[in-house]
């Protein structure tokens, strides 16, 4: 089947780029904004239609954070170039958010950890293990993702947890990960990984303050006497 039409064949008032120029970026839908970034579509669909497929396939715009090139390429019409454009845009959005709030957040409770990470990992469909690096004032230095996938000792090695902590001269860390099911009770693997990492932290002098599981609510292993 040949391509039905291109964006250039639309009336000017319906073209995303022209609408952006006339009314500003806020006048465009999510799919139109992403379509502008894509620039061109595929043989079967316009850039905006492809963008809509990407967003709906992810279950919403917020779920695109944490997506991989491989996952994005599962959408028909999305190749490596468009996947990279999207991931670059998402990373720029994340960095802009950090730049607009230069004050470092302080972690003083599990609720603070939940507030820091909920928007980033709560709705992802795979487990993302994050280590929150803290300075001596319990201010967040950074919070890198260490692994993606079901939490296990083979995936989360203490070496990988403390490598960024040592590099950043962190005084302590908080472990965190999401449960895609929404249930926040820790599994046996969660407890085993936490114990191994905490033991290693004691040896090298970087304390593991807590392990917080994010889902429908949150669970603090520290508060429940598991750490």
Curated annotation (Swiss-Prot):
Matches recorded under InterPro entries: MPN (IPR037518), RadC_JAB (IPR025657), RuvA_2-like (IPR010994), UPF0758 (IPR001405), UPF0758_CS (IPR020891), UPF0758_N (IPR046778)
Gene Ontology BP annotations: proteolysis
Keyword entries, A-Z: Hydrolase, Metal-binding, Metalloprotease, Protease, Zinc
Domain MPN: 106-227
Binding site for Zn(2+): 177, 179, 190
Cross-referenced CDD domains: MPN_DUF2466
Residue window of motif JAMM motif: 177-190
Cross-referenced PROSITE patterns: MPN, UPF0758
Name this polypeptide is given: UPF0758 protein Rxyl_1530
Organism per entry: Rubrobacter xylanophilus (strain DSM 9941 / JCM 11954 / NBRC 16129 / PRD-1)
Family: Belongs to the UPF0758 family.
Pfam families: RadC, UPF0758_N
Any GO MF annotation of the entry: metal ion binding
Residue ranges the record marks as coiled coil: none
Covalent S-S links between cysteines: none
């Amino acid at each position: 089947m040949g391509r039905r039409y291109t964006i250039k064949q639309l009336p000017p008032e319906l073209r995303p780029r022209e609408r952006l120029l006339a009314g500003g970026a806020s006048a465009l839908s999510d799919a139109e904004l992403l379509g502008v970034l894509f620039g061109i579509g595929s043989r079967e669909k316009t850039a905006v239609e492809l963008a809509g497929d990407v967003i709906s396939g992810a279950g919403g715009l917020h779920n695109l954070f944490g997506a991989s090139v491989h996952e994005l390429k599962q959408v028909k019409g999305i190749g490596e170039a468009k996947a990279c454009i999207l991931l670059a845009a998402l990373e720029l959005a994340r960095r802009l958010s950090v730049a607009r709030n230069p004050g470092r957040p302080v972690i003083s409770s599990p609720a603070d950890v939940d507030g820091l990470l909920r928007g980033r990992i709560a709705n992802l469909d795979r487990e993302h293990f994050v280590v929150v690096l803290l300075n001596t004032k319990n201010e967040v230095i950074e919070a890198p993702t260490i692994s993606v996938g079901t939490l296990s000792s083979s995936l989360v090695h203490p070496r990988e947890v403390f490598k960024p902590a040592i590099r950043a001269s962190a005084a302590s860390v908080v472990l965190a990960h999401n449960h895609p099911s929404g249930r926040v009770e820790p599994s046996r693997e969660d407890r085993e990984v936490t114990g191994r990492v905490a033991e290693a932290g004691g040896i090298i002098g970087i304390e593991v303050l807590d392990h917080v599981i994010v889902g429908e609510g949150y669970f603090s292993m520290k508060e429940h006497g598991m750490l």
